[in-house]
């Protein structure tokens, strides 16, 4: 039990730090290990979601004046609808299948962001918003890591890093709130999840403080590539275990 408490605390620090520094990645980071220490995959994604929601809430309180709703609502509405559907499907899927899908997803995400993110530009049209929201909803509902598709959209739509951070965190806050309600309805919000949240919340605040300093002073490009490599290795591990 003591080891689990320490792991949750450290994972929460790392995930919150990544989220605060880059604007996304809480679920990607924490879901590399969380499924192995939680009773079920659904409970792991639920705990990841409420911890990520807390991280986003802290940032939104600080950056709310930079929110532009007309660029946010179309992708957000799409995400909510798709992610809720994915959560209902999740209840009926086998764990080893999810392990395989998660491993493949993490490898693809790591390769994309390491090599292609700077080369691909997207327009902020309604079809793009719906597509990004759909992909984000599928990844969020199944794996608790809805960030990559949404981040690509917001990087292109926002004029500076302050607007980018405000928009991404408002998106993640609202999305995680809706997914948490759907997961609770499906029985994934258990006593174990509540206890895990208590263990992880202190780590969330610590990671947010450190990440805030890094966001102000460093570019973080080297950090991103380290994270992408870690995600890819983790994805390969999931595939081998499955």
Task: Label each residue range with its predicted role.
Residues 60-74, 90-100, 120-124, 189-195, ...:
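Interfacial helix-loop-helix linkers and transmembrane-helix boundary segments
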Residues 43-115:
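Membrane helix-loop-helix hairpins that form the core translocation module of multi-pass transporters
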Residues 44, 85, 89-90, 95, ...:
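Hydrophobic alpha-helical transmembrane segments in multi-pass integral membrane proteins
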Residues 68-79, 100-105, 124-133, 163-170, ...:
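Cytoplasmic-side transmembrane-helix entry/capping segments in multi-pass membrane proteins
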Residues 17, 21, 33, 37, ...:
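Membrane-interface helix caps of multi-pass small-molecule transporters
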Residues 4-73, 133, 137, 147-201, ...:
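Small-residue-rich hydrophobic segments that form or flank transmembrane alpha-helices
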Residues 101-143:
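Hydrophobic, well-structured mid-protein blocks that either form specific transmembrane helices
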């Amino acid at each position: 039990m003591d080891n689990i408490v320490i792991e949750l605390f450290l994972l929460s620090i790392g995930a919150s730090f990544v989220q605060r520094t880059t604007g996304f990645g809480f679920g990607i980071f924490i879901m590399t290990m969380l499924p192995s220490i939680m009773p079920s995959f659904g409970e792991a994604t639920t705990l990841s979601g409420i911890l990520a929601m807390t991280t986003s809430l802290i940032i939104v309180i600080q950056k709310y004046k930079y929110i532009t709703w007309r660029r946010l609502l179309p992708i957000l509405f799409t995400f909510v609808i798709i992610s809720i559907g994915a959560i209902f499907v999740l209840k009926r899927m086998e764990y080893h299948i999810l392990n395989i899908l998660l491993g493949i997803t993490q490898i693809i995400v790591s390769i994309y962001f390491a090599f292609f993110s700077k080369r691909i530009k997207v327009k902020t049209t309604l079809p793009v918003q719906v597509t990004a929201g759909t992909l984000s909803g599928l990844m969020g509902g199944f794996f608790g890591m809805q960030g990559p598709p949404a981040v690509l959209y917001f990087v292109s739509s926002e004029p500076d890093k302050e607007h980018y951070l405000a928009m991404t965190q408002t998106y993640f806050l609202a999305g995680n709130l809706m997914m948490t309600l759907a997961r609770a309805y499906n029985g994934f919000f258990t006593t174990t999840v509540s206890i895990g949240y208590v263990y992880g919340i202190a780590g969330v605040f610590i990671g947010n403080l450190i990440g805030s300093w890094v966001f102000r002073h460093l570019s973080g490009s080297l950090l991103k590539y380290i994270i992408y490599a870690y995600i890819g290795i983790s994805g390969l591990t999931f595939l081998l275990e499955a």
